[in-house]
Amino acid sequence: MEQEKIRIKLKAFDHRVLDQSVKQIIETVKRTGGVVRGPIPLPTRKRKWCVLRSPHKFDQSREHFEIRAFSRIIDITRFTPQTIEALMEINLPAGVDVEVKMRG
């Protein structure tokens, strides 16, 4: 029988805010007696756009934009009810998307 585990996936456009959130989650889990695996960095997703600067002609003048989405995975293998309670009460910075899944 597999042991239950919690997988937390974090996404953000700013890697500094993302790493700060990951650090906060790991400290909370360790403080409440849980065992953490990670953070596992996933590949950065880059999206690029090319836009004409002029509304009518002059195709040679273009502007390029890029946005990068950073993501990390944290696995919590052993946890207590206090760990889950502490995770629910964490205040993460704005701009960090969190997905939580229970497995096992």
Swiss-Prot record:
Gene Ontology BP term (one): translation
Gene3D superfamilies xrefs: Ribosomal protein S10 domain
PROSITE patterns for this protein: RIBOSOMAL_S10
Pfam family, one: Ribosomal_S10
GO cellular component, one term: ribonucleoprotein complex
Single GO MF annotation: structural constituent of ribosome
Keyword Ribosomal protein: yes
Key words, A-Z: Ribonucleoprotein, Ribosomal protein
Function: Involved in the binding of tRNA to the ribosomes.
Family: Belongs to the universal ribosomal protein uS10 family.
NCBIfam families from the UniProt entry: PRK00596.1, rpsJ_bact
Classification via PANTHER family: 30S RIBOSOMAL PROTEIN S10 FAMILY MEMBER (PTHR11700)
Subunit structure: Part of the 30S ribosomal subunit.
Name this protein carries in UniProt: Small ribosomal subunit protein uS10
